[in-house]
């Protein structure tokens, strides 16, 4: 199965990028569409899917909770608030990526401060994140009430999670984030696996639990942040990708397979969104939300039947 996943990614990516050639038309126009529209869109889908898959795997491993993911605990919402603030308030003064990073890291800091006060981790992190997520989403809605209707529409599409009109700058954002933060997580993989045995056992085996936890959370947060910058706050993918990977391999915290599963899910969702009748313009985030909700419902039904 591990050898099949890269092949699936290549097939989906090849088909996704070659769409204009299947539709016929002028060859020069097709070349332009391929280089400036479909190829960047495909590369962003691969990168954002991989980043979200990795981020979800880390959050679920650290919280020891299947609901741990950057969209549920407020990281994506914080990144959205930061990106919108930069694009609407501090126009041309800061890159959108910088605003998104500040927003996401502020949310992470608030969650960690809450956990420090309560002195607990795990489920408490999920609850704290959900509360902060609700507050961040309220800020987003408040921001939308003060902008022009055209801007509000564009922001709403982006907030749904969209791969439309992706550029090479978006490819650069996600393409630079994955090698840096992905390799950082890869370097922490062994201590993270040891920490699954329990913090006390990990400390006995020489793992600095607090340092590994903090670095892993920062790397996972920044991966999710750059996915949001590149493709908008796509929901459920970071939650579902680690579950599917575990179902396939029966092993926890497989970073590379989880990244590929995330890419496959986002590429598939984008192809499904584009397969709808022209003019429907369904954001890919709507598709991932629907598929993710169905998947979780199936899991709940199976658990209930047991």
Predicted regions and their residues:
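Alpha-helical transmembrane segments in inner-membrane proteins
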Residues: 1-306
């Amino acid at each position: 199965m591990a050898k099949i996943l890269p092949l699936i990614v290549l097939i989906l990516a090849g088909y996704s990028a070659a769409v204009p050639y299947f539709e016929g038309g002028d060859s020069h126009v097709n070349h332009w569409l391929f280089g400036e529209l479909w190829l960047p869109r495909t590369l962003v889908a691969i990168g954002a899917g991989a980043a979200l898959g990795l981020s979800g795997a880390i959050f679920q491993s650290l919280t020891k909770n299947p609901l741990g993911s950057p969209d549920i605990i407020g990281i994506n919402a914080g990144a959205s608030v930061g990106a919108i603030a930069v694009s609407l308030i501090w126009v041309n003064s800061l890159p959108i990526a910088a605003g998104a990073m500040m927003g996401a890291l502020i949310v992470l800091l608030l969650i960690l401060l809450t956990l420090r006060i309560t002195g607990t981790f795990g489920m408490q992190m999920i609850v704290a994140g959900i509360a902060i997520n609700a507050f961040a989403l309220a800020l987003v809605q408040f921001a939308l009430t003060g902008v022009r209707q055209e801007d509000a529409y564009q922001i709403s599409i982006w907030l749904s999670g969209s791969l439309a009109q992706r550029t090479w700058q978006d490819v650069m954002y996600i393409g630079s984030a994955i090698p840096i933060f992905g390799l950082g997580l890869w370097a922490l993989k062994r201590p993270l696996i040891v920490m699954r045995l329990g913090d006390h056992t990990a400390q006995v085996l020489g793992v600095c639990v607090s340092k590994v936890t903090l670095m892993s959370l920062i790397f996972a947060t920044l991966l999710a942040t750059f996915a949001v910058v590149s493709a908008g706050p796509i929901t459920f993918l970071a939650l579902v990708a680690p579950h599917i990977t575990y179902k396939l391999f029966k092993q926890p915290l497989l970073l590379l397979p989880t990244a590929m599963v995330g890419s496959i899910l986002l590429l598939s969702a984008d192809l499904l969104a584009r397969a709808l009748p022209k003019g429907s313009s369904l954001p890919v985030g709507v598709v991932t939300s629907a598929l993710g909700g169905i998947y979780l419902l199936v899991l709940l039904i199976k658990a209930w039947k047991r």
